[in-house]
């Protein structure tokens, strides 16, 4: 027994020293114990335990436990001390239950000390960040950095849609909302992929030069004149398209392919109202549509796409046209009768005129949506014009186009009677709008056909 007692006493003494060190650590953090008392707690022994009992009663062990209890452990008291110490002051700031640092003036809480110090300066009015060139002072370092750009002339923030530059991010956001009608996106900030998307969109718009787009023209022949299209302010409409919608449409267009049915695609097509108008051609002027080339046949997709025609010798640029899908399935059909001579020639050559006014571009009512690379459709499912060597996916468009050819001479304009040499000259005739120059004949035919604007 004489050998075991020293071991027990030594164990209790070691445990008391451990508690003393823990108490000293807690007191150093909370700042509730002065330096003199901290020196006394480092001496150990019974005096350390008494000082611990006097300063921190909640952390002290009962005297009976140190004398009679061989274990000498009072674990619940140690656990309570750790729980209570979590709510104590840390670096002069009180911590909340979720571990954040709480402001002593209000209910603001922050995980970082630097952010909390900046917040406290709002209450104290302290502005340590001062400009050496003017009386400007701020409580935030980032505000001083933005202010110094006004002296240096640096403008790191640039608008992706125009040449506007500014020194502050908030000014750029205001510019987007005011100039480009760009609504702020709720939630998180745009990711890097969205920024790259805007960069690609900017390059595409700059390459097109904001010129006229080749779109489906629903106007009668009397309205096909050399004037700016209603999309001349295309650059001001692009920013209204949100980046999320842009990516969604882009992914959808790439994932569709040829696996879907043309009728299903026509339901999802934003231009599906054109098919309704095309179905009323028996009583209304025919809508405008563009021809297609045998090299790149049309393919069902969610939006019209561009088809290039072989360039004529007299014209340097390629004729870019677009073909809209119809809700009715396409089937081969022969050349229509001559009673279509008064129909609008927009199905092919006339739309080529609008195609020549711009480079091969995207044809869609939503101009920010890119046109994916589309595979070639089987020519047997298309309507073929033997004179112009063009393919049409719509029977109505094919009928309108064939009505532009003369009955005796296929390369004679059925609108104004102008005779062309070949298919290239015939296409250039409508692309230039030459038939509109014959005002007397066009006026007579418009009156005869009861065509109204």
Swiss-Prot record:
MF terms in GO: chromatin binding; DNA-binding transcription factor activity; RNA polymerase II cis-regulatory region sequence-specific DNA binding; zinc ion binding
ZnF endpoints (C2H2-type): 101-123, 129-151, 157-180, 383-405, 411-438
Major localization listed first in the record, in broad terms: nucleus
Species this chain originates from: Xenopus laevis (African clawed frog)
Name this polypeptide is given: Zinc finger protein Pegasus
InterPro entries in UniProt: Ikaros_C2H2-ZF, Znf_C2H2_sf, Znf_C2H2_type
Gene3D superfamilies: Classic Zinc Finger
Location in the cell: Nucleus
Domain of life: Eukaryota
Protein's job: Transcriptional repressor that binds the core 5'GNNTGTNG-3' DNA consensus sequence.
Subunit structure: Probably self-associates.
Note: 'Pegasus' was the winged horse in Greek mythology.
SMART domains membership: ZnF_C2H2
Family under the similarity heading: Belongs to the Ikaros C2H2-type zinc-finger protein family.
Example of a GO cellular component annotation carried by this entry: nucleus
UniProt feature, compositional bias: Polar residues: 279-293, 356-368
Keyword vocabulary terms for this entry: DNA-binding, Metal-binding, Nucleus, Repeat, Repressor, Transcription, Transcription regulation, Zinc, Zinc-finger
């Amino acid at each position: 027994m004489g050998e075991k007692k020293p071991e027990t006493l030594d164990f209790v003494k070691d445990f008391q020293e451990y508690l003393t060190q823990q108490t000293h650590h807690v007191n150093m953090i909370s700042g509730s114990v002065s330096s003199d008392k901290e020196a006394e707690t480092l001496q150990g022994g019974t005096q350390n335990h008494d000082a611990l009992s006097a300063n921190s009663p909640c952390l002290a062990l009962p005297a009976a436990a140190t004398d009679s209890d061989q274990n000498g452990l009072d674990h619940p008291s140690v656990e309570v001390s750790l729980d209570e110490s979590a709510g104590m002051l840390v670096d002069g700031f009180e911590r909340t239950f979720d571990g954040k640092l709480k402001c002593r003036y209000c209910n603001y809480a922050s995980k970082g000390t630097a952010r909390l110090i900046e917040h406290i300066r709002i209450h104290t009015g302290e502005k340590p960040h001062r400009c050496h060139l003017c009386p400007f002072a701020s409580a935030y370092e980032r505000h001083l950095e933005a202010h110094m750009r006004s002296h240096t002339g640096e403008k790191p923030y640039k608008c992706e849609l125009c040449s506007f530059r500014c020194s502050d991010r908030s000014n750029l956001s205001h510019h987007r909302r005011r100039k480009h009608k760009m609504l702020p996106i709720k939630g998180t900030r745009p990711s890097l992929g969205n920024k790259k998307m805007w960069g690609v969109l900017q390059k595409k718009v700059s390459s097109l030069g904001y010129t006229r787009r080749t779109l489906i023209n629903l106007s009668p022949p009397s309205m096909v004149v050399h004037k700016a299209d209603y999309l001349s302010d295309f650059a001001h409409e692009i920013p209204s398209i949100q980046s999320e919608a842009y990516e969604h449409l882009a992914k959808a267009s790439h994932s569709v392919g040829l696996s879907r049915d043309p009728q299903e695609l026509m339901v999802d097509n934003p231009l599906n109202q054109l098919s309704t108008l095309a179905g009323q051609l028996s009583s209304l002027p025919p809508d405008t549509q563009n021809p297609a080339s045998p090299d790149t046949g049309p393919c069902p997709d969610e939006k019209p796409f561009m088809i290039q025609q072989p360039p004529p010798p007299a014209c340097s640029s390629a004729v870019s046209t677009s073909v809209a899908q119809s809700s009715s399935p396409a089937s081969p059909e022969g050349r229509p009768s001559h009673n279509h001579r008064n129909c609008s020639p927009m199905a092919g050559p006339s739309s080529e005129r609008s195609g020549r006014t711009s480079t091969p571009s995207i044809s869609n009512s939503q101009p920010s949506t890119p046109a994916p690379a589309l595979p070639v459709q089987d020519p047997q499912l298309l309507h073929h014009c033997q004179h112009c060597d063009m393919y049409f996916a719509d029977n109505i468009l094919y009928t309108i186009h064939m009505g532009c050819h003369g009955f005796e001479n296929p390369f004679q304009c059925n609108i104004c009677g102008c005779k062309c040499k070949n298919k290239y000259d015939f296409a250039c005739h409508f692309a230039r709008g030459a038939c509109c120059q014959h005002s007397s004949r066009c006026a007579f035919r418009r009156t005869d056909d009861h065509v109204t604007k």
